[in-house]
Regions:
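Structural motif
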Residues: 61-65
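Hydrophobic core residues within well-ordered beta-strands of beta-rich domains
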Residues: 57-59, 138
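Acidic/histidine-rich catalytic neighborhood of metal-dependent amide-processing enzymes
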Residues: 1-52, 112-122, 272
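Residues forming well-ordered secondary-structure scaffolds
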Residues: 17-18, 56, 81
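Metal-dependent amide/peptide-bond hydrolase catalytic core
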Residues: 41-44, 66-272
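Short, well-ordered coil/turn elements that cap or connect secondary structure elements
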Residues: 1, 31, 56, 100-102, ...
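A short, sequence-level motif marking secondary-structure junctions
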Residues: 53-54, 75
């Protein structure tokens, strides 16, 4: 017999915090499961499914410089100011980290000047400064998407080292916030895709191949990855304009996806 637990989750764009609490039911179910099937839409192509998803976390860089009249910038006892230092850090992120396979890191907001304010929830802020005053403060926020926790930890260490190598009379601090874990492309996940693709072909719907992780965002299925032997995502209803106010479900995909999922469950039951 097969025991099936269905966990209904909301849009990950609006997940409650802390994630350990809002995803507790999903994590608890995964701890007692062998296989996780995710029914989120994938990249919109019914010929693909996800055996891996990159994790996603946020970061905030706060930089401080020595304020002075702009005519004195670069003096040995004054330095370059906070904005130049923030620019150095971002440039080094770009030059030293972008070669990492399947990694992306994006600065989404930047503010700088004599004084800045930033609302983390609304993602809005203000900056005050004068053209003839060396910037005292700079703030940058962004995200990182990595294919594994190993990669994420390695990149975080590199980013911290880059931030620590400050220009004279500047200093920086980078903070990382909680986020979605990665689902690595394990042998078990790839085997599950083979079974699913076989089902699809037997039904006359064609082969199913793996989505390139660069074309897929984070998803709730990743919270199961550390606990199950196999996981796959993108088995659900197709959609258009995902994560927008105009998002719609493509009902024409429902019969195909339903048949695939039903036969997949049957074959998994027979295999066990």
């Amino acid at each position: 017999a097969m025991d099936i637990t269905v966990v209904m989750t909301g849009d990950e764009e609006l997940s409650g915090r802390p994630l350990a609490l809002s995803k507790k039911a999903l994590i608890d179910a995964a701890k007692y499961a062998d296989i996780a099937l995710g029914f989120e839409n994938g990249d919109g192509n019914p010929a693909t499914a996800n055996v891996s998803r990159r994790g996603s976390i946020g970061w905030k860089l706060t930089v401080t410089g020595k304020p002075a009249h702009s005519s004195q910038i670069f003096r040995e006892d004054i330095g370059a100011g906070a904005i130049y230092e923030a620019a150095r850090i971002l440039t080094q992120f770009y030059t030293e980290l972008r070669q990492e396979d399947l990694l992306t890191f994006n600065p989404g907001n930047i503010l700088g000047g004599t004084k800045v304010t930033f609302d983390d929830q609304a993602k809005t802020g203000t900056a005050f400064g004068k053209d003839n005053i060396i910037a005292e403060t700079a703030l940058v926020t962004g995200d990182i998407r990595a294919i594994s926790e190993v990669q994420l930890n390695r990149v975080k260490t590199k980013m911290q080292a880059i931030v620590a190598a400050s220009y004279p009379h500047t200093s920086g601090v980078i903070e990382f916030s909680e986020g979605y874990p990665a689902m690595a492309p394990t042998a078990g996940n790839k085997r599950l895709l083979e079974i699913y693709s076989g089902v699809s072909q037997d039904l006359g719907f064609g082969e199913v191949t793996a989505v390139n992780p660069l074309r897929a965002g984070a998803a709730d299925v990743s919270f199961t990855a550390d606990y199950v032997d196999m996981a796959i995502d993108a088995l659900g209803l197709g959609s258009n304009k995902g994560h927008t106010a105009e998002e719609t479900g493509d009902l024409a995909t429902l019969p195909t996806q339903t048949k695939r999922a039903a036969i997949l469950l049957l074959r998994l039951q027979n295999a066990h």
